[in-house]
Amino acid sequence: MNDDRIILDNVSRFYGEVLGVNGVTLSIPPGVTSLVGPNGSGKTTLMNLITGLVRPSRGRISVLGVEPSQPQRLFRFVGYSTQFDAFPKGLTGSQFIYCFLRFSGRPAAECRKLTTRAIEQVGLVEAADRKVAAYSKGMRQRIRLAQAIAPDPRVLILDEPLNGLDPLVRSETIALFKRYAAEGRHVVVSSHVLHEVDMISDRVVLMSGGYVVAEGPIRGVRSEIQEERPMQFLVRCRQPNLLASRAFELDHVVEARLLPDSEGVLVKTRDADAFCRALNHLALAGIDIEGVVPADDNVHSVYAYLIGSEEATK
């Protein structure tokens, strides 16, 4: 069924001779999906294609069964927040949301209700009647998010939505995304801050130079490259020397290194599932294992493995 997915089929977009994105094929299910990559990797172009702000040079796009070339249909269920910090002059936060809703043809009473709810959801009730021009950077980011969620959309497309938010508001915003995902909606966000993506996402789309280099659940992507890049596990135990010795007996383990504090072992393996099963047997055999933590199944590590550590830190 494609009517509950965002579909891109061999989509490319060129700006003259400049590549925006090339050959992108994706099938995005409900949930939180993060587009990840440094500036210039194609994240914003991909969002503009999904929302119909730019047309593909080739390929086909469908958003829950609707083509982006049909904006009147598309924006009945799509909310989009760009990263551009521009607002109409003279409007308060409430007026900004209300006018946006009225322009979409909704009755005034419904617009007032939706405006109030959206402003409550982003925590701007006390600032609702202040001019947007007097807002801080973080408050302007939140009022843009309020505009996107005000129509109660089934699909949210958000370009760098956490940029400029303080830690408390960032946490509340992430909780809002997860709540939308739990309701079966799509939340597509872009980010170049990789540690945030681990907190937000069900799935990731890793981009570089206009190409999709990997996509899927982050741990699934990590598992796919474990033969080339063995997975790392941090194992805390009271007998690290014995554990390291036993780990080296496993044919899929390529390294077992004692930690500097001598209270654990860092193990690299080409078969994570087999290693976890082996740990269970070692524990039953008497090795006192206190904890096991994957050391490199996060977005930053995977992106660095696929693209290079220099790109991953941009």
Regions found by a protein language model. Name each.
Residues 71, 197, 243-244, 275-276, ...:
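Short, well-ordered alpha-helical microsegments
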Residues 3-6, 13-209, 213-214:
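ABC transporter nucleotide-binding domains
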Residues 174-269:
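ABC transporter nucleotide-binding domain
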Residues 1-12, 309-314:
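ABC-family P-loop ATPase nucleotide-binding domain
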Residues 270-314:
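C-terminal coupling/interaction segments
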Residues 13, 255-258, 294:
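Hydrophobic/anchoring residues in structured secondary elements
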Residues 14, 90, 233-236, 268, ...:
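Active-site-adjacent beta-strand anchor residues
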Residues 75, 119, 222, 303-304:
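Conserved protein kinase catalytic domain
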